[in-house]
Amino acid sequence: MPKQQSRTADLVSQYMVLTKETMPHLARTSHRHWPVQNDHCFQRIVLDAVCEGVWYDYLLRPAYKNLTHDQAANAVDLCNDIISGDTDLITLNKQSLKWRGKILT
């Protein structure tokens, strides 16, 4: 496997652990103020932010198998920024829902 693909796969694995395990656990414990708790919600929010729109308008499904290296790296960075509090999950969730027509401005 080429080096770039290997690194992309590692980033995707990190993204999956962060959104499927780490962030849901934090949402149920130390980060109860977060607006979501389920893994698919974290994935929606992060992927929408990375794609700057509804992710499935930009990526084939399943998204994790179709992320570019840059998208995977951005997703991991964004997850870490959300966890550290450097990026506001509430704001990202609202933007994601706006893109999806779920809430009005």
Model-derived features with residue positions:
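Positively charged, phosphate-engaging catalytic surfaces used for nucleic-acid and nucleotide handling
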Residues: 1-105
